[in-house]
């Protein structure tokens, strides 16, 4: 029997502070819950939306009930007895970090049980010897930044100076990351990518998870805007991924949409589709759901929930994007084939109402739909790897080293 799996990952869509949130300074974080609360209290009204958060399709898959199980509180405005068509769980992260790579890798069988390298100092974040090596190897004449920063704020602060000097802007965050921002036209995209590749080679031995190229356009601080030509240079996964097993054992197709391929350092990816906006990600995903061959795993990362709304602490924008996605989800559900398994999940939290601009350590929703799947609560997962293990079980693959199968089809005991 030919099967397909569709994984829709809403980047940063946590559903409540996890049991170890205190260790990360994230007690009280609740991405879904706090957005729903703001909407319910009319604090997220705009020209595009108003009132309670309206996510009927996500609710039918068990989103609200998943949050209720995780936090003992139903998100405000949600139905305690929705017309449930999906099975649902919530998951605690096993990995030692709350970043994108840790969440994604764990999901596909490679949890991070070691410590990434970090640049913890808020200012003068990068050691002098590293900066000296970068300048020597890349031949750049100077740099700007060298601090923790929001990507949108730092180009406002330093973008004009960058245009004067053409020095790249270096910055980081609480994640294991080295980000480089340059003007796409004045500095050049190819030159940026080449710089990032060289910096990645320098930082890889230090277990810095990613070097990220961030280009922007505009003429001054009032109109600088990041482009969609982001590129992530990631360390290769330390364990075999579900993708590789699928290709080896079933000659499957692994279809990356958005930044999935970059996150997994292109390991086990057979097809790649880029998209520059939430609308484009939805369009490309729907197209692949309609047209991708059987024996495929379609995996989309909806990055804009995180990059445009979570990190920017934009509750209204996040709520509006969720409602847009939910409307598209109806079309995706209607386009599924007889033996498709749909999974919706997240990789961490990024509560737009929380202090700071960093990710938040939260439980994630695990929502599953298949025509023969019993619509019920699947329990608490102790690792995101339960998602990958469930996919392996569904596709008839060798089991992963981590995680348990959550699937319980109708007629099974």
UniProtKB/Swiss-Prot annotation:
Residues annotated as binding Mn(2+) 2: 306, 311, 359
N-terminal signal peptide: none
Parts of the chain that traverse the membrane: none
Keywords for the protein's UniProt record, in alphabetical order: Cytoplasm, Isomerase, Manganese, Metal-binding
Pathway: Carbohydrate degradation; 2-deoxy-D-ribose 1-phosphate degradation; D-glyceraldehyde 3-phosphate and acetaldehyde from 2-deoxy-alpha-D-ribose 1-phosphate: step 1/2
Cofactor binding: number and manner: Binds 2 manganese ions.
Chemical reaction(s) catalysed: 2-deoxy-alpha-D-ribose 1-phosphate = 2-deoxy-D-ribose 5-phosphate; alpha-D-ribose 1-phosphate = D-ribose 5-phosphate
GO cellular component, one term: cytosol
Cofactor: Mn(2+)
InterPro entries tied to this protein: Alkaline_phosphatase_core_sf (IPR017850), DeoB (IPR010045), Metalloenzyme (IPR006124), Phosphopentomutase_DeoB_cap_sf (IPR024052)
CDD domains to which the protein is assigned, alphabetical: PPM
Enzyme Commission number(s) of this protein: 5.4.2.7
One Pfam family matching this protein: Metalloenzyme
Record GO biological process: 2-deoxyribose 1-phosphate catabolic process; 5-phosphoribose 1-diphosphate biosynthetic process; metabolic compound salvage; nucleotide metabolic process
Family designation: Belongs to the phosphopentomutase family.
UniProt-listed HAMAP family: Phosphopentomut (MF_00740)
General function of this protein: Isomerase that catalyzes the conversion of deoxy-ribose 1-phosphate (dRib-1-P) and ribose 1-phosphate (Rib-1-P) to deoxy-ribose 5-phosphate (dRib-5-P) and ribose 5-phosphate (Rib-5-P), respectively.
Full protein name: Phosphopentomutase
Gene: deoB
């Amino acid at each position: 029997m030919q099967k397909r799996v569709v994984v829709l990952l809403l980047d940063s869509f946590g559903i409540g502070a996890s049991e170890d949130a205190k260790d990360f300074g994230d007690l009280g974080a609740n991405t879904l819950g706090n957005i729903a609360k703001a909407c319910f209290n009319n604090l997220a009204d705009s020209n595009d939306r108003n009132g309670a958060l309206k996510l009927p399709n996500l609710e039918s898959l068990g989103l609200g009930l998943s949050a209720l199980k995780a936090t003992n509180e139903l998100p405000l405005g949600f139905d305690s007895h929705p017309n449930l068509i999906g099975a649902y769980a919530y998951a605690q992260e096993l990995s030692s970090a709350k970043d994108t790579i840790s969440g994604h890798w764990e999901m596909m069988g490679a949890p991070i049980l070691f410590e990434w390298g970090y640049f913890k100092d808020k200012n003068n974040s990068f050691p002098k010897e590293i900066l000296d090596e970068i300048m020597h190897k890349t031949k750049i004449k100077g740099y700007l930044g060298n601090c923790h920063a929001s990507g949108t704020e730092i180009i406002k602060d330093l973008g004009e100076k960058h245009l004067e000097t053409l020095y790249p802007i270096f910055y980081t965050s609480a994640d294991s990351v080295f980000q480089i921002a340059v003007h796409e036209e004045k500095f050049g995209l190819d030159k940026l990518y080449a710089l990032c590749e060289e910096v990645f080679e320098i930082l890889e031995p230090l277990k810095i998870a990613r070097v990220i190229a961030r280009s922007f356009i505009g003429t001054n601080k009032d109109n600088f805007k990041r482009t969609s030509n982001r590129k992530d240079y990631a360390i290769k996964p330390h364990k075999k991924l579900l993708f590789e097993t699928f290709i080896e054992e079933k000659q499957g197709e692994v279809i990356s949409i958005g930044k999935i391929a970059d996150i997994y350092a292109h390991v086990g990816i057979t097809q790649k589709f880029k998209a520059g906006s939430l609308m484009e990600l939805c369009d490309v995903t729907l197209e692949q759901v309609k047209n991708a061959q059987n024996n495929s795993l379609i995996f989309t990362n909806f990055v804009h929930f995180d990059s445009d709304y979570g990190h920017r602490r934009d509750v209204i924008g996040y709520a509006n994007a969720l409602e847009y996605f939910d409307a598209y989800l109806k079309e995706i559900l209607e386009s599924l084939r007889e033996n498709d398994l749909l999974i919706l999940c997240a990789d961490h939290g990024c509560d737009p109402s929380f202090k700071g601009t960093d990710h938040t350590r939260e439980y994630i929703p695990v929502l599953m739909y298949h025509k023969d799947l019993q619509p019920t609560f699947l329990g608490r997962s102790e690792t995101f790897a339960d998602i990958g293990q469930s996919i392996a079980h569904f596709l008839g693959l060798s089991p992963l080293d981590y995680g348990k199968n959550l699937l319980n089809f109708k007629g099974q005991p």
